[in-house]
């Protein structure tokens, strides 16, 4: 069964009495302006926290910031639940923050590394480097002595390099690079000639100074340019009408009728 709700109608006097009752019983302790005062930074600068006398609020402040909260902040730990601020307050969620204790940690590295470099170690390193360089030089000299490049008179015959490549590939017509260049005249080997003098850049092929010197006399064989006067007048294609008549008379015997227009040639 559904019951309809009727609105409550109060008179002005009844509403005033209810509001006065609420103010007298619930809002009678209104904090003053002095209770809401926040000290400034300049007032906190000279605050003496190391007072000689006993502080009545010392225990309350220590309970407000427990040591576990300070350690958690310094270690960067995330606290999902708010800590217990005072013995009166109960933890929210039914879980308490674990008690943290300071602990000394050893952050030294005890891994064995290379020994410190002293005079004896430097001498040993220098000796090993000298021995390695001597062995490499001896191996290079031995390879240079064992390898002899043949230079036969006829390229490709009685050449050890050619025989090596032929035996390794099975191609009897194969030649080494030096014999190939000599056989097909890719390069011409000749004794080193004397240094040739550098050409004189101030003379041309005819032993004349380059560039030529300017003078008043004109050299022989030079074509002089003919000056032409430039005008804006149009030139006629023919000198007179008789030139056109003479050209057409060569192709036809009938005189040209100049009173009519000439037909276009397709």
Swiss-Prot record:
Keywords, ordered alphabetically: Activator, Early protein, G1/S host cell cycle checkpoint dysregulation by virus, Host nucleus, Host-virus interaction, Inhibition of host innate immune response by virus, Inhibition of host interferon signaling pathway by virus, Inhibition of host NF-kappa-B by virus, Inhibition of host STAT1 by virus, Interferon antiviral system evasion, Metal-binding, Modulation of host cell cycle by virus, Modulation of host E3 ubiquitin ligases by virus, Modulation of host ubiquitin pathway by virus, Oncogene, Transcription, Transcription regulation, Viral immunoevasion, Zinc, Zinc-finger
List the GO terms this entry assigns under cellular component, sorted alphabetically: host cell nucleus
Q: What does this protein do?
A: Plays a role in viral genome replication by driving entry of quiescent cells into the cell cycle. Stimulation of progression from G1 to S phase allows the virus to efficiently use the cellular DNA replicating machinery to achieve viral genome replication. E1A protein has both transforming and trans-activating activities. Induces the disassembly of the E2F1 transcription factor from RB1 by direct competition for the same binding site on RB1, with subsequent transcriptional activation of E2F1-regulated S-phase genes and of the E2 region of the adenoviral genome.
Cellular localization per UniProt: Host nucleus
Show the segment(s) annotated as Disordered: 195-226
Extent of motif Nuclear localization signal: 261-265
Q: Name one Pfam family in it.
A: Adeno_E1A
Q: Which family does it belong to?
A: Belongs to the adenoviridae E1A protein family.
Which stretches are zinc fingers (unnamed)?
159-179
Task: Give the protein name, as stated in the record.
Answer: Early E1A protein
Question: Mostly located where?
Answer: host cell
Any single GO BP term: symbiont-mediated perturbation of host cell cycle G1/S transition checkpoint
Look up the coiled coil feature and give its residue ranges: none
* Region Interaction with UBE2I, annotated ranges: 75-145
Q: Which organism is it from?
A: Human adenovirus A serotype 12
Segments of this protein annotated with the region Interaction with RB1 in competition with E2F1: 39-47
């Amino acid at each position: 069964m559904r019951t309809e709700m009727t609105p409550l109608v109060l008179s002005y006097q009844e509403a005033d009495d209810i509001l006065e009752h609420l103010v007298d019983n619930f809002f009678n302790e209104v904090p003053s302006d002095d209770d809401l005062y926040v000290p400034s930074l300049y007032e906190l600068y000279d605050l003496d926290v190391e007072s000689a006398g006993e502080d009545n609020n010392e225990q309350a402040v220590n309970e407000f910031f427990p040591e576990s909260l300070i350690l958690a902040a310094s270690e960067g730990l995330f606290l999902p639940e708010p800590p217990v601020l005072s013995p009166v307050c109960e933890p929210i969620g039914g879980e308490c923050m674990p008690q943290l204790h300071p602990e000394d940690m050893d952050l030294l590295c005890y891994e064995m590394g290379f020994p410190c470099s002293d005079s004896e170690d430097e001498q040993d390193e220098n000796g090993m480097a000298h021995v390695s360089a001597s062995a490499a030089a001896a191996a290079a000299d031995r390879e240079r002595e064992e390898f002899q490049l043949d230079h036969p008179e006829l390229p490709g015959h009685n050449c050890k390099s050619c025989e090596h490549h032929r035996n390794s590939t099975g191609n009897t017509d194969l030649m080494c690079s030096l014999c190939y260049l000599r056989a097909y005249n890719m390069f011409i080997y000749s004794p080193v000639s004397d240094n040739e003098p550098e050409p004189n850049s101030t003379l041309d092929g005819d032993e004349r100074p380059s560039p030529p010197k300017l003078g008043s006399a004109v050299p022989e064989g030079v074509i002089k340019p003919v000056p032409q006067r430039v005008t804006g007048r149009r030139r006629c294609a023919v000198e007179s009408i008789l030139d056109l008549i003479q050209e057409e008379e060569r192709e036809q015997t009938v005189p040209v009728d100049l009173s009519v227009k000439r037909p276009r040639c397709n």
